[in-house]
Amino acid sequence: MVLSAADKSNVQAAWGKVGGHAADYGAEALERMFLSFPTTKTYFPHFDLSHGSAQVKGHGAKVAAALTKAVGHLDDLPGALSELSDLHAHKLRVDPVNFKLLSHSLLVTLASHLPNDFTPAVHASLDKFFANVSTVLTSKYR
């Protein structure tokens, strides 16, 4: 799914509004995903998945950092996320459907924190962006 110039602008503007909250929003999205889709917990058997756990916060920060990197490389997501793609495909072997579940949780989290900025156009652009990130992260499964 190709991001248009308007999509790229929307993604960059929305992520800019996230600012210093990226790690917190990443952790919140993970917690939301674990609660809404309990099967996703199977990839984190060694984590304390309770509300506010340091491990969820730490992984949320990693998710946020990867997304921040992706936002900075919208024209080369495969290059920017190559190592992360290798990790998820070859070492962690995460079921690709889980990226869609996390994407949904991220959208809900962003909508709840940025209600005035989360217009239908921004929603659509972020959805396309997360879909592209998911596609890149699963590209090496083949």
From Swiss-Prot:
GO terms for MF: haptoglobin binding; heme binding; iron ion binding; organic acid binding; oxygen binding; oxygen carrier activity; peroxidase activity
Gene3D superfamilies: Globins (1.10.490.10)
Recorded GO CC terms: blood microparticle; haptoglobin-hemoglobin complex; hemoglobin complex
SUPFAM superfamilies registered for this protein in UniProt: Globin-like
GO terms for biological process, alphabetical: hydrogen peroxide catabolic process
Domain of life according to the entry: Eukaryota
Tissue: Red blood cells.
Annotated residues for binding of heme b: H88
Binding site for O2: H59
Alphabetic keyword roster: Heme, Iron, Metal-binding, Oxygen transport, Transport
Metal-binding in keyword set: yes
CDD domains: Hb-alpha-like
Domain Globin: 2-142
The UniProt record lists the keyword Iron: yes
Function according to Swiss-Prot or TrEMBL: Involved in oxygen transport from the lung to the various peripheral tissues.
Assembly behavior: Heterotetramer of two alpha chains and two beta chains.
Family statement drawn from the similarity comment of this UniProt entry: Belongs to the globin family.
Name of the protein: Hemoglobin subunit alpha-3
